[in-house]
């Protein structure tokens, strides 16, 4: 019997920066490097450009990842409305969806939560997330850990999580850093896929266009010098979720 190839898809909600294209060949390769395993097939849908899988093809995939974006998840842009529609279908199908930053907020919106501008302002740099211990089940895809260090880069946030959500992590900047719904939706406000080089380049870009106050960017650079993200643990956690693995 021929072993069936496990298929996953990235919904890319941001254009590739020149830096990422030059260094990695595009964000798609960054995500596959972080969350992919040998023998899998990963497909790219540039949802920001209106590229979506056909309804009849959704069943072919084991899981989906929604990337970050400079766009607001709470707007009525055509492609965002279409993305929400596709995610609703996947939710009904109980397909695994890993939402990251903008993707985290899209899943919140789809599930009836509230998204908007971050109450405490933009968060850029290395941040520490406190894990809510009593929602972690022993042997689940989520390790028994007290905290996670993650790269942050956002100005919006989940203001009210969906009623059905379990809030797994919070920080001093954001009340809903990580949430899950049942066993098929997992969302991070931060960026498990980013490394320091990608973040530093983003800081330079937003500084040039004055997208964020300079004081915030200086603090971000300082945090990058002082701390390290829990990259390996974050990648393994996301893989465990997408592939139905357990920690023990």
UniProtKB/Swiss-Prot annotation:
Keyword RNA-binding: no
GO molecular function, one term: peptidase activity
GO cellular component: cytosol
E.C. number(s) listed in UniProt: 3.4.19.16
Keywords: Cytoplasm, Hydrolase, Protease
UniProt subcellular location: Cytoplasm, Cytosol
Broad EC category: hydrolase
Domain spans labelled Glutamine amidotransferase type-1: 17-212
Catalytic activities: an S-[(1E)-1-(hydroxyimino)-omega-(methylsulfanyl)alkyl]-L-glutathione + H2O = an S-[(1E)-1-(hydroxyimino)-omega-(methylsulfanyl)alkyl]-L-cysteinylglycine + L-glutamate; (E)-1-(glutathione-S-yl)-2-(1H-indol-3-yl)acetohydroximate + H2O = (E)-1-(glycyl-L-cystein-S-yl)-2-(1H-indol-3-yl)acetohydroximate + L-glutamate; 2-(glutathion-S-yl)-2-(1H-indol-3-yl)acetonitrile + H2O = 2-(glycyl-L-cystein-S-yl)-2-(1H-indol-3-yl)acetonitrile + L-glutamate; (Z)-1-(glutathione-S-yl)-2-phenylacetohydroximate + H2O = (Z)-1-(glycyl-L-cystein-S-yl)-2-phenylacetohydroximate + L-glutamate
Matches recorded under Pfam families: GATase (PF00117)
Pathway recorded for this protein: Secondary metabolite biosynthesis
GO terms classed as biological process: proteolysis
Active site: 101, 191, 193
Family of the protein in this entry: Belongs to the peptidase C26 family.
PANTHER family: GAMMA-GLUTAMYL PEPTIDASE 2-RELATED (PTHR42695:SF9), GLUTAMINE AMIDOTRANSFERASE YLR126C-RELATED (PTHR42695)
Primary role: Involved in glucosinolate biosynthesis. Hydrolyzes the gamma-glutamyl peptide bond of several glutathione (GSH) conjugates to produce Cys-Gly conjugates related to glucosinolates. The gamma-Glu-Cys-Gly-GSH conjugates are the sulfur-donating molecule in glucosinolate biosynthesis.
Stated name of the protein: Gamma-glutamyl peptidase 2
Originating organism: Arabidopsis thaliana (Mouse-ear cress)
Gene: GGP2
């Amino acid at each position: 019997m021929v072993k069936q190839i496990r298929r996953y898809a990235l919904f890319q909600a941001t254009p590739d920066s020149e830096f990422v294209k030059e260094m990695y060949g595009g964000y798609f390769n960054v995500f596959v490097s972080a969350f992919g395993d040998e023998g899998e097939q990963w497909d790219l849908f540039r949802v920001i450009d209106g590229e979506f899988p056909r309804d009849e093809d959704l069943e072919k995939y084991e899981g989906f990842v929604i990337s970050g974006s400079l766009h607001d998840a709470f707007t009525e842009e055509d492609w965002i409305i279409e993305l929400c529609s596709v995610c609703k279908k996947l939710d009904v199908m109980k397909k695994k969806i890993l939402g990251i930053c903008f993707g985290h907020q899209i899943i919140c919106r789809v599930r009836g939560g509230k998204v908007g501008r971050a109450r405490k302002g933009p968060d850029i740099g290395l941040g520490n997330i406190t894990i809510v211990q009593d929602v972690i089940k022993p042997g689940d895809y989520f390790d028994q850990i007290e905290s996670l260090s993650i790269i942050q880069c956002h100005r919006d946030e989940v203001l009210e999580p969906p009623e059905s959500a379990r809030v797994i992590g919070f920080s001093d900047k954001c009340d809903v850093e990580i949430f899950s719904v049942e066993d098929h939706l997992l969302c991070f406000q931060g960026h498990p896929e980013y490394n320091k080089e990608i973040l530093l380049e983003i800081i330079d870009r937003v500084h040039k266009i004055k997208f964020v106050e300079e004081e915030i960017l200086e603090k971000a650079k300082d945090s990058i010098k002082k701390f390290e993200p829990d990259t390996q643990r974050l990648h393994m956690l996301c893989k465990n979720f997408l592939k139905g693995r357990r920690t023990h």
